[in-house]
Amino acid sequence: MGSSSFLVLMVSLALVTLVAAEGVKVNIEKPGVCPADNIRCIKSDPPQCHTDQDCQGIRKCCYLHCGFKCVIPVKELEEGGNKDEDVSRPCPEPGWEAKPPGVFSTRCPQK
């Protein structure tokens, strides 16, 4: 085996190791739950994220308003709670709150 064949073999092994390590990435889910999404879509938007790890800070990767986006999560509801009745949760994005299908408000509900 010549030195060039050995070099090609070593580079190939290094690439296979890197690709295998990338595929084993652990997907750690961030705390909180995705906001309720009552929007009906004709066509989905291209995803802005695939996992929570794609999102900065506390944001989670959630399907919201016709596509996967990084959004501020809502706190988990206490046992027996109803997500649709929980008006104390933060807005999915600053200044916006999803209302019943297709209607938006520019402010969050107050307690």
Curated annotation (Swiss-Prot):
Disulfide bonds join C34-C62, C41-C66, C49-C61, C55-C70. Pfam families: WAP. Its main location: secreted. One of its GO terms (molecular function) is serine-type endopeptidase inhibitor activity. InterPro entries: Elafin-like_sf, WAP_dom. It comes from the Eukaryota. One of its GO terms (biological process) is defense response to bacterium. The keyword Transcription regulation does not apply. Antibacterial protein. Putative acid-stable proteinase inhibitor. Residues 1-23 form the signal peptide. It is found in: Secreted. It comes from Callithrix jacchus (White-tufted-ear marmoset). Residues 80-111 are annotated as: Disordered. This is WAP four-disulfide core domain protein 12. Keywords: Antibiotic, Antimicrobial, Disulfide bond, Protease inhibitor, Secreted, Serine protease inhibitor, Signal. GO terms for cellular component: extracellular region. PANTHER family: WAP FOUR-DISULFIDE CORE DOMAIN PROTEIN 8 (PTHR47769:SF1). Residues 27-74 form the WAP domain.
